[in-house]
Amino acid sequence: FGIKGILSPAYLKPVKYMEKAINQQDINLLKKAVPDEYAEWMTDDLEDDMFDLDSDYKIKIKVTDKEKIAKKDLEETLIDDYYVLDSIAEDAKAGYILEAEATLKQDGEKDTQDITLVVVKVDGKWVIVSGL
């Protein structure tokens, strides 16, 4: 991370975990990016399917925009718009909708897609609850 890592907002931490997990094909790192309830769903089957890319690839996720979800709307927005589990939405203390570009480099080719990630603070930890 260096200086940039020190200055990065805490809500970006799970995005970096996700990026690193995909690049290193590490399901345990990915579990750090999501709520415990989601991590429980990540079985060996998911690990096998998820890392079905050749070893010669790299993904880069660049957040291009953010929108803070108003505290008063947080639970309702998470449940109604992003289908987050009620238990997680109820415990969320803050949240952001992040617009990002995910760029996959593989075999000299580059493919960029726009993605939307939703991050929330639950039990003092920022996690991704939508957009995986």
Where are these regions (language model features)?
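Generic signature of mature, soluble extracytoplasmic domains
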Residues: 19-23, 27, 56, 107, ...
